[in-house]
Every structure is written in structure tokens, then in C-alpha cells.
Amino acid sequence: YKEDFHKIVSVVGGGGKTTVIRAMLRECMENSDGRIPCAVSTTTHIQKTNAEYFLGEPSMKMFRKKLSDYEAVWMGREIRKGKLASFQKEFLEEVSREPVLLLLEADGAKHFPVKAPAEHEPVICEKTGIVLNVYGMRAIGKKIKDVCFRIGEVEKILGKTGEDILRPEDIMTLALSRSAGRKCVTDEM
């Protein structure tokens, strides 16, 4: 990590994205070589946190204060109890110019461990440097219809039905598909 490091990580895929983001944030805050300034937000929706580093309004002044105080910011506008939506794109762009690792939840899965995206998904920020695709491995061995979000898309990509059992190779197929795990991902990401 360097002072001039500017990186955006967009997290997409099935259920577990927020858990992965929380773990990454914790690693940044507990790094033995010194904390890595980190901000968390979304281009879609994400769970709210009650931590003191939560930012509920798009203010660069407050963003910088929280980052200075905690070296972490979890941000978004509350749309219902416990759920956040993204701030305006312009605010996220301004945040991305700060010396901070920006972790963005960029997809929704309604808590299903596996998914294939709809036409409008995922919502990956164009300045993203890394796309992290999450799949819940607890889905393996279960019927596709019971563990997959956007089942029609999953069936089409896998050439299977909802009654079929999800296998490890199915997750690999989804992860590598330009219609699923690699959708909207450029070679630079």
C-alpha cells in the first residue's frame, strides 16, 4: 500500500458480498503495517452499519473527518431500516480521488448464495481496478431453484433446470461466463 494508491474494488455475485466487504474493511483497519484508509459504499444497495464511522449524507467535509478519525468510512443514504442506497455518482467519483481504498457492493442477490445478473446488472464503476465475484459454496449439492437468484438466467447459462443439483463445475461456469461472473468486467479489471 502506498500513499498515492487509488483503487476501487467492486464486489459482485451471490450472497456474502457484504460479509466479504466487512472482512476486507476489518483487515484494512487491523493491518499490522499500519491501517489502510478504506471507504465502503454501494452502486446498488448494502446493509447499514451502526459503527461510529458511518456517513449518512454526501459531505466531503464529513467524509474526510471520519476518515481522519477512524481511517474507515461506511457510507450511503438510508432507504429503509438497515438498508442503504448509493450516494450520487458524482460524490463517489470525488471519494475515489481521495487516498483511500474504495470497496463497492455492485450487485444484489436477495440473500441467495448464487446468481446470474439481469440485463441491468451488475453496476460496476468504470474506474474499478478489481472485480471480486462472490459465490456461496453452501449452494453446492442443492437444487438450483433453491439456491439461485435469477434462476432463468442461471438455467440458460448452465443449460440445466431448476430441479438439477448445483455442482462445483457449475459455479466455475458461472464465474467465467461473460453473461454472469465476468459480465461488465473489462480486461483491465
What residue ranges belong to the model's regions?
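Walker A (P-loop) phosphate-binding motif
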Residues: Y1-M29
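Short coil/turn segments at beta-strand junctions that form active-site/ligand-binding loops
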Residues: F5-K7, G34-P37, E98-V100, G129, ...
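General beta-strand structural signal in soluble alpha/beta enzymes
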Residues: V11, C38-T42, W74-R77, L102-A106, ...
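Gly/Ser/Thr-rich loops at beta-strand to alpha-helix junctions
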Residues: G13-T19, H45-I46, G108-K110
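A short acidic (Asp/Glu
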Residues: V20-I21, N50-A51, K115
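N-terminal phosphate/diphosphate-binding loop that engages ATP/GTP or pyrophosphate donors
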Residues: L25-G82
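Loop/turn-to-beta-strand initiation segments
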Residues: D69-V73, R97-L102, I130
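Conserved catalytic-core segment of NTP-binding enzymes
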Residues: G82-Q88, E93-R97, D107-M189
